[in-house]
Amino acid sequence: FNGDVTTWDLSSCSSMTNVFKHTGVDAGRFNQDIGGWDVSYVTNMGNMFYGATDFNRDIGDWNVSSVTSFYYTFYTASSFNQDLSDWVMKDGADVRGMYDDSPMENNNSYKAPGTF
């Protein structure tokens, strides 16, 4: 899937689980500008960009304060290397494997709470 998603209305969306995870040949090539999405109601981003090997867009302004699961969000997203230092994450959010096998895995400035 690589259709235009830049104008998706996510105002009622609570789960973005697996949205761009290995959904076909083009899944790895996904690299659209989704920085303007309102994800303030999303509670689950588990596996969202898992395997999205080309994705490297600025999503640093997203309001992720409602998210309780970032489980493997960027796992094997081998191009993703954006500044997420302004993300305010909920205490106790599940961040297991959030950056594993991505360029951000060993970058301490991007570590999620509780992963140091």
Language model features: what each stretch is:
Residues 1-116:
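Negatively charged
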